[in-house]
Amino acid sequence: VIVNSPNNPTGKMLSKNDFLELTKRIEKFNCYLISDEIYEKLVFGSITHYSPGSIDNIKDRVITINGYSKAFAMTGWRIGFLAAPEIVVRKIIKLQQHINTNTVTFIQKGVYKAFKIKEYGLTRFNESLVEKVDYMMNVFSKQPKLSFLSPDGGIFSFVNIKSTGL
């Protein structure tokens, strides 16, 4: 099962209760949950980000993938990490070492510098995302053939254009 919360492209998030419900299925079918949490710091809705890797009874079946490019406004700078059971990490390393070798130095230095900045603008960035969501909701609410799903986080939203016939 692959989950992206906040989601791209809708901006919707799964709640803690959603994840607890999903836990039942992970246990029932004895499968893995891949949790893409790249937008975890870009949360502005009423739902708090929740990582399923913190659920004790399935943490041995959760692969969390994340990165720094979105939270530090370094989109396009591919640098990330994963947290997973050791056996999974070993297998991923075998695969990854044949796909790419390393992250270039300037990106590593950029992320290092970003970690050193106490307040790097994330609060203001999230506030600006809320302003943009409010603006979009205002614009789309005046369009009878468009509906808008208000996001909880991330940098995306989803507009339903079905009524336009396109």
Model features per residue range: what roles?
Residues V1-L166:
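PLP-dependent class I/II
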